[in-house]
């Protein structure tokens, strides 16, 4: 079987397994073992199998296409995937001002197709389709691996939910604490649906399908952030996350409608029939036409929509003269180039890009819609680890990267400024926070700003590379913080201190995470994963400054200053928690290392946080992979 047939089948199975787990747990629930403990085994087995299938797809892709060139082109700039198999979109010099024009581009590989057509409404086909390239495969491996570790971790962390629970944070009107039944099976039920939704976004082949799973991710986050629904803080946090994201989604709908009304399709790549003939041109190939060497070009549909008065005038003139409709169409086609040169339709391209990015601003907690993410820590720590690393917040950055070929230079400038403001603002707040999970929450907001900044200044590879490295070390950091909270029953770092003696596994795996997020390394020799991805971002910002002095200085100093703040607040967190002497002896005396089912996933993630950025001669690295 060829890779073009095998890969969609593998990834479809990997995508649907968490859905099957969700359905089984919904139907059987508490009947799955004693107190529903079997729900965790089913959910964990499903996501582990998804990872295995994704890894097989990864190996198949490597075996077929191999690696390319030097990591990240030394600047994090890379071709942008667009189109079906032999089509791609390249971020050109005119869109960023710093990429050298390539006379003839060699497009990266991608596969697109339709699994099922739900219905046709005029020219609009609503389909369940796929779009698979190197980014899709990398995201599948990352999401399923991290989710697998979190599932194992959650088996230990959520064990209290196997029995009746006394919630000491909820006081009833009679002064008693809340007593309720455990919700162990329900937690894994939501977790499975969450993973299914995120994988649906990644594999989706059209904007409509993305939007469905985009909203499903939002619903799952509402359920999981508000898991302790009786707590007012959790209820408010869930509502806040849901409502703030709807603000961004309103803009996303506007962007979708601009694309559909002018281009007549929701598909990313071109769709072909059984004979290989293109039956529907996708968004990417219309915006970055292969005939135009994949340079950004206002599509004919947008030009016609913007010049509708001229089009109507031509049609009326030909009808009045008794000409055939084809004569009017030929004149319209001959006028398109002139209208495009006059700027017709370009504003539609900008509106579509800004609209799509508005949805990404909400999901990835960018300024000014960043306010929901720090409160998302009200959910159980495994939820925080998943939300802040591989699923919800990653979706916004992923979609920005996926739509990259569509973004005009003005849109990329908006992306860069949003990222720069977000990364500095969140980092300054993290410096003074005392709640261990809140520090990590603001750290997530700041790192997402880094990714958006990279994308805005033309560093597609750098931004996507940091998305993947960040997912590993941030999930590790959140799970370590959960291990601390599980042992000490407090989130406040001033009440901790000296815990490395009681929790060595947690302490030193968290140290690895801290070193990874600050980008520690020995220059020109070796470093933690963040060393490579952050270096690519800062190098890209410097290159942008060199070619765009008007805006570039802001982005470079934001990236460099944010890196310094990150180093400060992360080591402040580690020292306050694990170093020094105990500041609250009651907390210290009751502290203990987490069970093996909780700290072994930390070790696995620590290895990836250390080495996911490495690249060896003859072995494909993540940056090389994304270059495809």
Predicted regions and their residues:
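Hard-cation-handling environments
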Residues: 591-628
